[in-house]
Amino acid sequence: MAFNDNPAHVAALNQLISELEADGVKIVDKRGWFWKALHYIVLVVTFGGQRDFLKGYYTTIAHWIGVPEGWDERSAASRFAVLKHEYIHICQARKLGFGNAVVGLPLYGLLYLLVPLPLGLAYFRWRYEREAYVIGIRARLELQPHLRMRLIDSAIKQLTTGRYGWTWPFKRTVRRYFETHVPEATPVTEGDLQLVP
């Protein structure tokens, strides 16, 4: 638990984790040879634009959510939003795999990484990430409504730079999308939180 974490946020996070685990989702540390190899591949493919893959980024592969060092030190509100975002990627892979994320992974990976281009105009990555970012931002705003513009700015920075392989490099278009799809939020009570979509 992060220092001075809000108990209601911790309760919401714990409930979400329980629901995800019941749905077959596995939260794993990004340690070991597989994640290190993936880090170097990402580093090369993004021409050095993504240097924080192991320490600052979350990665979903089928029904596994890889979390970086320091996961447990992040605020409950941040972890809640991240898990909501990453769960959307699991749902996207499941749609392509007839309900099974592992079956959907090859097609999902192909679309996410290569169509129509791997860098610069990655339309499916833009579609998949914008959906997940909207859900993640909305989830964070349920707990911390004052962060709206900061979270939108962060999403824009991620999706229009080398961090995500210049997914959709049109900053004004990306900003307009998020400002339209992420409404101003008001705090909700614990009973009002929608945990798993």
Give a label for each model feature.
Residues 70-72, 86-107:
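Catalytic Zn2+-binding segment of zinc metalloproteases
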Residues 58, 64-83:
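Short pre-active-site segment immediately N-terminal to the catalytic Zn-binding motif
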Residues 36-47, 100, 104-116:
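Short hydrophobic helices that act as membrane-entry/anchoring signals
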Residues 1-66:
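Auxiliary, metal-adjacent structural segments of Zn-dependent hydrolase domains
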